[in-house]
Amino acid sequence: MASGVGAAFEELPHDGTCDECEPDEAPGAEEVCRECGFCYCRRHAEAHRQKFLSHHLAEYVHGSQAWTPPADGEGAGKEEAEVKVEQEREIESEAGEESESEEESESEEESETEEESEDESDEESEEDSEEEMEDEQESEAEEDNQEEGESEAEGETEAESEFDPEIEMEAERVAKRKCPDHGLDLSTYCQEDRQLICVLCPVIGAHQGHQLSTLDEAFEELRSKDSGGLKAAMIELVERLKFKSSDPKVTRDQMKMFIQQEFKKVQKVIADEEQKALHLVDIQEAMATAHVTEILADIQSHMDRLMTQMAQAKEQLDTSNESAEPKAEGDEEGPSGASEEEDT
């Protein structure tokens, strides 16, 4: 195998094997480098070509005169030195990159530990703040409960002093049962106006000369009326719709108009039935009010009689007491006068 450059190639000719492989296992040379003069097998030739891009490799011919590099061997030596320097630089740069990566990883670990410590401190501070907020909320809730208790007590006292809503609603209902013109109970029914009136409305009010009836008579009359008007109107409506729809001469617009007219009639019947039901409710309420009024009037009359009797009894008691006092005085003077006469 050949070794060295320059004059060494003149002394040691090529033996036809690869200079990079082990001597005992070196295969036959296939390429030779024109710059450095070494012979290489196919694998080492590719490696040499990639490592030294400026070198030129040619096919090695066995038995031919060995090719020698230029006499100036300094170029090859310089190139090899430059290659070594480049390799050393690459190694140094790789080592620097590794150290930088280690430093970065260490700094990242330190930052992570700092972040974890900060997170822990933040969590602790959040827990402390949450506990403080819970304590404040509990204290505020206690204060609110106390205030609510006080306000409820005040509200109860105010409610006791004010009217109950149910009482107010009852007062409104009672006011509605009164005549708006005269303020009396609605105890009569006007047949012409179909309205509840008081006893003064047909005398000095707007219902003079109208046909009147009692509440009981009006209630029985309205209740006895046939309530099948709505049912009859619906049956008649269905029959008319069937007849109208079977007529081929009837257009779409005419059918719409017919349906609207028929439903207006049914709506009028429904309104009449509604008015009748409302009249019955009003009459029942007026009858109940009149009945209660009669009962209250009887109670008041009974109370008046009792009060009169109590006043008379008191007057008689006072009179008897006044008549009894002079007799008692005369009895006291009699014995004293007799004793004086005996002394004289």
From Swiss-Prot:
It holds the Pfam family zf-B_box. The keyword Metal-binding applies. May play a role in the process of differentiation and maturation of neuronal cells. May regulate the activity of TRIM17. Is a negative regulator of PAX6 expression. This is Tripartite motif-containing protein 44. Zn(2+) binds at C179, H182, C201, H207. Highly expressed in testis. It is linked to Aniridia 3: A form of aniridia, a congenital, bilateral, panocular disorder characterized by complete absence of the iris or extreme iris hypoplasia. Aniridia is not just an isolated defect in iris development but it is associated with macular and optic nerve hypoplasia, cataract, corneal changes, nystagmus. Visual acuity is generally low but is unrelated to the degree of iris hypoplasia. Glaucoma is a secondary problem causing additional visual loss over time. Interacts (via coiled coil) with TRIM17 (via coiled coil). It comes from the Eukaryota. Residues 75-92 have a biased composition (Basic and acidic residues). PANTHER family: E3 UBIQUITIN-PROTEIN LIGASE TRIM. The keyword Transferase does not apply. A zinc finger (B box-type) spans 174-215. GO terms for biological process: innate immune response; negative regulation of protein K48-linked ubiquitination; positive regulation of cytokine-mediated signaling pathway; positive regulation of defense response to virus by host; positive regulation of DNA-templated transcription; positive regulation of non-canonical NF-kappaB signal transduction; protein stabilization; regulation of gene expression.
